């Protein structure tokens, strides 16, 4: 991995909560659904952030790399001030291994279960991991078709874990907001423990439909803007020909939401959730701040409170 350019050119409060970085030649998991035939490097990604005035970002472990988080951690190490990570781990991941990920800027794990067998999160084999995640103050990011979300959400909430649901909850593109699974997801807005990413709409919407506007309106109604977060889904794997970074950002900015809502979705909520502004959970006492924060202190607290995300 080359040294990325312009690591901290942008001081915007905006946060991109969903992007992937990878290169050809990395070891791939046997259970992969696909593998891109191109590079999506941190260098390229940071240039996009700077171009679009995005100050911070969350790198999500690509599904095709499985539980080998080395490339993700290498990317995070390039700018611990600006980047956070979401890893993929095995159910038997040790407390020591998770603590090391925590120190390197990881804030949660992703369960990418698209086209995968559903795990029994209530099984004894999962209990130790869920308890360890809770002690760290981590969240679980859930990626699954809307119709299958409810049982997993119930178990994760029962374990006391915050949950982030990917890509509008992945309703069936043919059903959109009428997908019963999406309607069920709306009911979790009252828990105060579930967040939804308004991202990757092209994965769950018929082109040209009004899905993004309709779904976002319903999510705001049931969750509040303070439980929604935007992600670019860069590099838009399998949809590279129909989407780019600027279009992804415009999808949110052109919805006609008021300034306070956009500020919550794009700035305030993700800044707090991913620990860019401050880490208030009990994990700090046991494991400390991220390595970068130990050196530099908390970045840009005042900017989170002042920004107008639309500009």
What annotation goes with each model-predicted range?
Residues 31-60, 65-79, 99:
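Alpha-helical scaffold segments that flank or form the walls of functional sites
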Residues 66-147, 197, 201-202:
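Active-site gating/metal-coordination segments in enzymes
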Residues 2-13, 38-56, 218, 224-229, ...:
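Mid-to-C-terminal alpha-helical segments outside catalytic/metal-binding sites
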Residues 22-25, 64-67, 92-93, 116-117, ...:
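Active-site environment of divalent metal-dependent phosphoester hydrolases
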Residues 15-19, 57-60, 83-87, 109-111, ...:
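Hydrophobic faces of well-ordered beta-strands that scaffold small-molecule active sites
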Residues 122-229, 278:
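Catalytic pocket-lining loop regions of alpha/beta-barrel enzymes
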Residues 18, 49, 72, 101, ...:
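Conserved, mostly hydrophobic/aromatic
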